Amino acid sequence: MPAKGRYFLNEGEEGPDQDALYEKYQLTSQHGPLLLTLLLVAATACVALIIIAFSQGDPSRHQAILGMAFLVLAVFAALSVLMYVECLLRRWLRALALLTWACLVALGYVLVFDAWTKAACAWEQVPFFLFIVFVVYTLLPFSMRGAVAVGAVSTASHLLVLGSLMGGFTTPSVRVGLQLLANAVIFLCGNLTGAFHKHQMQDASRDLFTYTVKCIQIRRKLRIEKRQQENLLLSVLPAHISMGMKLAIIERLKEHGDRRCMPDNNFHSLYVKRHQNVSILYADIVGFTQLASDCSPKELVVVLNELFGKFDQIAKANECMRIKILGDCYYCVSGLPVSLPTHARNCVKMGLDMCQAIKQVREATGVDINMRVGIHSGNVLCGVIGLRKWQYDVWSHDVSLANRMEAAGVPGRVHITEATLKHLDKAYEVEDGHGQQRDPYLKEMNIRTYLVIDPRSQQPPPPSQHLPRPKGDAALKMRASVRMTRYLESWGAARPFAHLNHRESVSSGETHVPNGRRPKSVPQRHRRTPDRSMSPKGRSEDDSYDDEMLSAIEGLSSTRPCCSKSDDFYTFGSIFLEKGFEREYRLAPIPRARHDFACASLIFVCILLVHVLLMPRTAALGVSFGLVACVLGLVLGLCFATKFSRCCPARGTLCTISERVETQPLLRLTLAVLTIGSLLTVAIINLPLMPFQVPELPVGNETGLLAASSKTRALCEPLPYYTCSCVLGFIACSVFLRMSLEPKVVLLTVALVAYLVLFNLSPCWQWDCCGQGLGNLTKPNGTTSGTPSCSWKDLKTMTNFYLVLFYITLLTLSRQIDYYCRLDCLWKKKFKKEHEEFETMENVNRLLLENVLPAHVAAHFIGDKLNEDWYHQSYDCVCVMFASVPDFKVFYTECDVNKEGLECLRLLNEIIADFDELLLKPKFSGVEKIKTIGSTYMAAAGLSVASGHENQELERQHAHIGVMVEFSIALMSKLDGINRHSFNSFRLRVGINHGPVIAGVIGARKPQYDIWGNTVNVASRMESTGELGKIQVTEETCTILQGLGYSCECRGLINVKGKGELRTYFVCTDTAKFQGLGLN
């Protein structure tokens, strides 16, 4: 899998950055907007109080109220301005919250004490202090502990003040005690519902923040994955080929999921283009075979990577593109993908630089190696064929001729054809190359060749800047491979997949070293990617991520849809722009929805207690509350039936309905409307049923007057608690946080209209028992006073004020909660969508990487831990196979009919792709494709063993050989099928050998997995010296195959280049299909 970086907010990773980000999130998304909402609502309340004061006549009688109201307005106006200064708001947020609370409490107590001596009542400003308690939890930016503390102080202070004042002016009575107890129940209900509301909001806020961060992280990972994907693909393929292949992979993944199989098309996609006027360079290291035999696995990988890394640097400097590495052979092309008029000069210059580099190595280390270079100019077909292990390659007769030029070249010289010479424009001096004398093909085709004279050879050599050549005892004690490795490490070639190892970006983040050299005092094995904080690119990554997070957090503000246009919501953020998403949101399940019903039931209990304590105990009261209790009991039974079923194993329809409360929106909405409607109704239903028979006042009889006053007061005292009950009914609507805004608005509006109508048309107001009339009745002389009582004790006015105040507060709060819920749903959807895209990118990266490296090798370069060491592995027993289609060289022609060879390559692509499809079969899961070389297919078995298990038992080692034979037979069968459909008569020539090999990854610009060793060379010779339609093996391999039940036919002694005479055998393919039983 692609590297999983340590991102800004990892799970379980805490830090000041995370705390600051969460603080910014809370400030922007909740604390700021909610506090601003409270300030606006409270300011509106102050304005309403000022209007009420002026409407009562002489304002001088209400100086305390007016003074406090104007003072609070001024404070709130200043706070509203400070809300837009983020630095001050963040620093003084808690202080501002305390100041706001203190202003509200002070205003409340001014209302309590204003004209207190005129009429003392236990219900003084209970609704207003209930408002303070509720907003402490819902609108003020306190923590849960802080809110509980402030709410408790608000509650206790009111109870203590009212209790002491009531005892100071009147004789303590049971009636006053019951009223104070009812006040305590009301405040307790406000605190509990407020705490429930805050807990729900904190959970929702934390979830929204988590999903927001995850979504941003996924976006960031997605960008990194895309960059890694591009770099990974570009490390194997040129840009003009990679884009089409990448799109094809993504399309395949979308259509077929994660299945690693291609669609069943009649033809496989061909990514090949024709280019004219290019130069092809082949270079072979003479003497490297002897050097490799002396190298340890790591030394071999280091030497190859440093040499070819140096060649890659030379290629880049000379505008050449490396095509492929074949053992110790390196070939590249100039003029791809963009045509260059200097392509021939580029290749010649590169060839001379390569010879010079090898000369420096030879002089510095004393190792007898040299470079043989062949160049030809012409036309090529370039691209990728097959399905697995993509490698950019070139094909044409001109490519084959360039290969011949290298084979017929002279060590240390650049061998060119006449076609290349014509493109040099006399930039270099040349001499006759006599290539026809060294290669029969050149002689047959009458190709005249030349050797380029290096201009540097005619200049005096500069003072040596390289390591001194070891002499004497030092040379005897140090192996050639060691001298070679130590010297080449000073070149500092980049390691394979260095661009994938950086945990945050595709850049390796390494400090640039001039001339590609690394200081010798810093051993390469200890180099590590610098910390991201030290890298300018890392800092820019941090900055961009911070900006993205801050931008996302700004979008979470509940004031944003009101102030600016949103891409996701209509104005005021109550409806999604996308209709399908709106429906999905409304149908989405709501976890823990049953807890809302439990909280609403608690409010019902509190309303019931208030009525039982203070209201006349009539039959209507019992019936109404009994019916609502039955309704709520049924609702709770439906909601918590699954909880109760744990005690009772029987599960029936009730449990089924209970499980659907959180998942079925219609059922949930029905139950919520029924619950809220019941509470709103039962809070007021008994008011019109109260017996309001006002007694007649006796004239001139003070005792009768006081008795009538007492009876009237007894009738009027429940009225303020009906107001409180109605307010608690309003609050019950707000505990259903995830309920849609529209039903809440409808319920609150209908309830408000009904309450205002019932209160204002109630017969209790005909005596004005709680306003001016009560003040008059309390006069000790029995006469009525002309001075009106304080308007803050006028229940009719204040009831309307409190109901409208709570209506506005709950309406704005519900709108913000609805917006939060929609944001939560929106970010979850975005997270899900982007997570799917991220998984697609991961799968694409995996497929790409597995098309470059075997899966067990890919794990070395990617993962949670950085691994910058060389990858190299030695194996004791690996079976290597070369399978070629020699007839394809004859079949391949370049003419107008086959589009200059393109159609011939299309057939080769079908052959290689069909071969690749066999690798998907479980039977051949142990077979690893290494590469294709023209029409030759190279594979190996036994490379996937885990590290430390290379020396496994012989039986399992030998099983790989049988698998490879079966794979070779399957290749022959596939080729027969292609012959039947294409009307050709291609035959496969296969060579197999087994033995020790060294595997490794070399090349930084184009990392390539390869295997080396005598086993590989002999397997290649087995193929090149074999016969069509047969599998040739060595004598050692034959012995093992016979032990597995295969029949082999002795071919005899044959001459193998570099090995002398070897006895070889042909595997009897007719019987192999039936006798390969030892594999199981």
Swiss-Prot record:
Its EC number is 4.6.1.1. One of its GO terms (cellular component) is plasma membrane. Residues 515-529 have a biased composition (Basic residues). Its cofactor is Mg(2+); Mn(2+). Its main location: membrane. Activated by the G protein alpha subunit. Activated by the G protein beta and gamma subunit complex. Activated by GNA13 and GNA12. Ethanol and phorbol 12,13-dibutanoate significantly potentiate adenylate cyclase activity generated in response to the activation of the prostanoid receptor by the agonist prostaglandin E1(1-) in a PKC-dependent manner. Inhibited by lithium. It is an enzyme of class 4 (lyase). Residues 454-474, 504-546 are annotated as: Disordered. Pfam families: AC_N, Adcy_cons_dom, Guanylate_cyc. Mg(2+) 2 binds at residues 284-285, 328. ATP binds at residues 284-289, 326-328, 372, 931, 1010-1012, 1017-1021, 1057. Residues 477-482 are annotated as: Mediates regulation of adenylate cyclase activity by C5 alpha-induced G- beta and gamma pathway. Residues 279-406, 879-1023 form the Guanylate cyclase domain. Binds 2 magnesium ions per subunit. Is also active with manganese (in vitro). Keywords: ATP-binding, cAMP biosynthesis, Glycoprotein, Lyase, Magnesium, Manganese, Membrane, Metal-binding, Nucleotide-binding, Repeat, Transmembrane, Transmembrane helix. PANTHER family: ADENYLATE CYCLASE TYPE 1, ADENYLATE CYCLASE TYPE 7. Belongs to the adenylyl cyclase class-4/guanylyl cyclase family. The protein contains two modules with six transmembrane helices each; both are required for catalytic activity. Isolated N-terminal or C-terminal guanylate cyclase domains have no catalytic activity, but when they are brought together, enzyme activity is restored. The active site is at the interface of the two domains. Both contribute substrate-binding residues, but the catalytic metal ions are bound exclusively via the N-terminal guanylate cyclase domain. This is Adenylate cyclase type 7. The lineage of its organism: Eukaryota, Metazoa, Chordata, Craniata, Vertebrata.
